[in-house]
Amino acid sequence: MIFAMNHQDIDRRSLMMHRIIAARLRAQPELMAVAHANMARWNCPERGWWQEWSTILSSQTVEEVIQLIEREDEDACRIRQSAPFAGILTPREVWELKRNFKEENAAA
């Protein structure tokens, strides 16, 4: 069976993934260095999303960032779309998460 994802599905999957990232950050706050390294590598301050994340990472505590990425409101959903947390989860973990999400939602 083919599972076509709409925007709500994509947002729910992103929230699920970010909750796992949040748990990892709580257990290992030093992983915030991954986000800082990604921002330095992406270095595009002319982009609004980059500026927003740069401000978030430089002005908020790890716990505040975690609370932000776990929120379910529209603003948090928008912010998660450009989150700099690539590399905190392994490619295998991301693949398994996506597969599990697809299987759970295809059955619904």
Where are each of the predicted segments found?
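Basic, alpha-helical nucleic-acid-binding regions used in initiation and control of genome expression
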Residues: 2-108
